[in-house]
Swiss-Prot record:
Disruption phenotype: Acvr1c mutant embryos develop normally, with none of the known NODAL-related phenotypes found in these mice, suggesting that Acvr1c is not an obligatory component of the NODAL signaling pathway, at least during early development. Acvr1c deleted mice however develop age-dependent metabolic syndromes, including progressive hyperinsulinemia, reduced insulin sensitivity, liver steatosis, impaired glucose tolerance and pancreatic island enlargement.
Matching Pfam families: Activin_recp, PK_Tyr_Ser-Thr, TGF_beta_GS
Tissue expression from the record: Expressed in interdigital regions in developing limb buds.
Residue ranges of the TM segments: 114-134
Gene: Acvr1c
Species, as recorded: Mus musculus
UniProt key word Cell wall biogenesis/degradation: no
Full protein name: Activin receptor type-1C
Domain GS: 165-194
Functional description taken from the UniProt entry: Serine/threonine protein kinase which forms a receptor complex on ligand binding. The receptor complex consists of 2 type II and 2 type I transmembrane serine/threonine kinases. Type II receptors phosphorylate and activate type I receptors which autophosphorylate, then bind and activate SMAD transcriptional regulators, SMAD2 and SMAD3. Receptor for activin AB, activin B, activin E and NODAL.
Quaternary context: Binds the type 2 receptor protein ACVR2A.
UniProt-annotated binding residues for ATP: V201, G202, K203, G204, R205, F206, G207, E208, V209, K222
UniProt topology in membrane: Single-pass type I membrane protein
Ranges where the Protein kinase domain occurs: 195-485
Active site: D323
Amino acid sequence: MTPARGSALSLALLLVALAADLAAGLKCVCLLCDSSNFTCQTEGACWASVMLTNGKEQVIKSCVSLPELNAQVFCHSSNNVTKTECCFTDFCNNITLHLPTASPNAPRLGPTELTVVITVPVCLLSIAAMLTIWACQDRQCTYRKTKRHNVEEALAEYSLVNAGKTLKDLIYDATASGSGSGLPLLVQRTIARTIVLQEIVGKGRFGEVWHGRWCGEDVAVKIFSSRDERSWFREAEIYQTVMLRHENILGFIAADNKDNGTWTQLWLVSEYHEQGSLYDYLNRNIVTVAGMVKLALSIASGLAHLHMEIVGTQGKPAIAHRDIKSKNILVKKCDTCAIADLGLAVKHDSIMNTIDIPQNPKVGTKRYMAPEMLDDTMNLSIFESFKRADIYSVGLVYWEIARRCSVGGVVEEYQLPYYDMVPSDPSIEEMRKVVCDQKLRPNLPNQWQSCEALRVMGRIMRECWYANGAARLTALRVKKTISQLCVKEDCKA
């Protein structure tokens, strides 16, 4: 073999080895990955972090995927609260991190405090050692029975959240003492990765919704496919808007990007409402007059909070939903509603007078689109236009509820708006012909005139359906009108 051919062969072998190494991905230490020898692989970065929880340093090491790395939230430290390192070589996160030590001017410990500081850790270490020995022996006995780890018990051994606290406690603590934008990211990730999925409860254009369990509590897990990353990121961003939390808006818990090496799942964890969507509820149930008013008032309350701007250092921007429909509203145990599915929502910055519209090709549901959206005359530079479109959609939802209201034993069967005018899956052209050209609206049955509550609801619907968006009611006006009706009907909403 000539020297030239030998050199070419060596170069080829080197390139093959380099390609194989790149294909294998970056290997990192992962403290949560005991099933894979505490190792994970990623195309992003290795991640190590330490945070202060109940006065103790809690360390976590894992992989950060490319979407998480691009989001620029995992590689930033917070003074005296968290210290985070991201690196890009194999096992580079196998390092020891510590938070900054207290200042020299801190008061010295007395003899009693010093005794406690020394004694308590020694006792805890002894207990931990005994528990570790016992756990190892017990694991050897039970491993043959099942390979499925009880992640809810594992959380008690390694967790970034306080033992014995419920999700409501954690969310209340974060809302009361933090920025009001939800749980810390590390806590969200810990919760999401220790949820046990139970059964699938729904499917949509985004993916699937599962019923899950976390430490004995029910949660809902909305699982997006990787191709819907924009929808997942946008919805998580909107839900974590400061001061958004409200009893009539779906309670957000956590968001996480779960990558098992072959495919990626994008999780959105929220409160679980076993009665399902308003669409499902109305298909199954007939409602009383008081029940109708109670449902309608809770929807108006949630939408009014969403539309309202709260001014201040911990303020909230005005938000428009853009996809209000009965399938995007959930019914709680107390028979009130919570508005959900904020993936298409827009935010308004009143200071800069700008509208934050998501970069998402999907639009709202055609059947519920306002006339100005159907005929493309909506002024997208004015935020009020989006709020007015929401009001039109709410009027259609109220029509669905009112049809299921029993008055004198008479009740209509459940139907979608415009069920008798367009096909089951109408196009924009078909909806535009009915709503804009023919100026038709859902029919209000004559028997509604015999009931004051239904007469009021019918008037609200008509004032929500005006072709001129500026003439429609505001969410706050709808809320006040139905509140007065609620007092008359003694619905105790």
